[in-house]
Amino acid sequence: MKLKIAGSGGMFLIPNPFCKCPVCQEARIKRGRYERLGPSLYIEDIGMLIDTPEDIAVACDRQGITRIDYLSISHKDPDHTRGMRIVEPLGYDCIAGKGTPIQCIPLPEVVDDINAWNGDGLYYYQNILNCISINRANYAKIGSIELHLVNNKTHRGNMTFYVISDGSKKAVYACCDVKPFVPNELYYDADVLIIGLVSDDGILKDGSALDSAPFRDDMFTLDEI
């Protein structure tokens, strides 16, 4: 099982053009892997992309991702959905006016959220352009890969955590809205946890402490993890 983290920069890419913090300054100088794009994961074994941030086309090009056979969206937020137009060149031939749909596998609640927030965006791609085919599900098996979609529903709404396994290895992908982390037996015995919204030492870039920040209830520290 091979996973690629296509982007890990969160809602703002790194370097942020308006930021002069040490992390952004380092990224400007070193470039490459120090430049972090919007959050997304690619399961190479089955050609599945999880999430489409605004810069997903750049991320795919940088990571050498040349095919997407399956798509999933974790939740409705713009930094996970605004690059959804990537399905157009993949699944729609604008010259022939014909679509060849990509399988889209999201939680049912997430489909409803995205359509409510984005003007029926998913239905447009399915019913008008015919470039995706929506399969509302909380489980899928594609080849040797098993995929469990778990709704880590919190005060922020519906959020998908992914449990990805191939029979010998198991990974949990929890990219956003991670706190509170709702327990689930599917997470047991995972080999790796990929989790977002973690502060390494609880100190923010302006020197203030996480526990005094307004978003303190949304982030973990490494000690808490």
Descriptions of predicted regions:
Residues 77-81, 112-113, 156-157, 179-182, ...:
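Active-site environment of divalent metal-dependent phosphoester hydrolases
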Residues 46-104, 191-192:
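Active-site metal-binding motif and surrounding structural segment of the metallo-beta-lactamase
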